[in-house]
Structures are given as C-alpha cells and as structure tokens.
Amino acid sequence: MATDLMSVVEATQLRDDVPDFDSGDTVNVHLRVVEGEKERIQQFEGVCLSRRGSGPNETITVRKVSEGVGVERIFPVHSPRVAQIDVVRRGAVNRSKLSYLRGLSGKDARIQEQIRGN
C-alpha cells in the first residue's frame, strides 16, 4: 500500500519533456536562476559523464572546460529549476560512466560523434 502511494506521488513529479540521451552526448542544460526578484535562464553546455538514479531522483553529471578549467555540475533531471535539456550532438562511447575524461585534456578528451542510420 505504501509503495503504491509512493509511486503515485513520484509519477506526478516526473517531467515528460526530457529528451532521450546517454553518456557521451553533448547536452545543453537550461537552468532557472533566481537573483533577488529577477529570474533568468543560465545555460550549461558540456558532455554528459553519467546518468544515475531513476524516477524523480534521476541526476546527470555534465562536464565542460571553461577557460582551461574543468567544471562539472550535477543536475536533477526532473527538477523544476531545469527549464529544458537539449541534445547538441550524440557521442559514440562504450561506457555508461565516463569518469576517465577527467584526466584527459585537449584532443584526447574529444568524443567521436555517433552516426545514426535510418
């Protein structure tokens, strides 16, 4: 009974506009930022290193290099603070967690684009 109630409550918190993407894909996350009384959209574009969790607890780790410094952020996928997630390009990788990219720089950190057939 309690699990049925939990699943009903969790289903109301899920978003239906989350695109299909995996680790290795370059994503652009639009985040709502509130500063005082104003609200603006901040974009964070980078490579998705991992997806973990399920349901309303699902999170993604996105990494980008900004002015020579690697920056990683963890975003809750179904958070109301995340305005939208766009897939910029698909990456061809063979792993679900790309933590090895943290030690690479320059051309070594590139991910080959996945070519999808019809």
Swiss-Prot record:
Database matches in PROSITE patterns: RIBOSOMAL_L19
Gene Ontology BP annotations: translation
InterPro entries per the UniProt record, alphabetical: Ribosomal_bL19, Ribosomal_bL19_CS, Ribosomal_bL19_sf, Translation_prot_SH3-like_sf
Keyword Ribonucleoprotein: yes
Matching Gene3D superfamilies: 2.30.30.790
Pfam families cross-referenced by the UniProt entry: Ribosomal_L19 (PF01245)
One cellular component (GO) term of this entry: cytosolic large ribosomal subunit
Keywords annotated in UniProt: Ribonucleoprotein, Ribosomal protein
GO function terms (MF aspect): structural constituent of ribosome
Biological role stated in the UniProt entry: This protein is located at the 30S-50S ribosomal subunit interface and may play a role in the structure and function of the aminoacyl-tRNA binding site.
HAMAP family, alphabetized: Ribosomal_bL19
Family named by the database record: Belongs to the bacterial ribosomal protein bL19 family.
Protein name, UniProt field: Large ribosomal subunit protein bL19
Organism: Salinibacter ruber (strain DSM 13855 / M31)
Gene symbol of the encoding locus: rplS
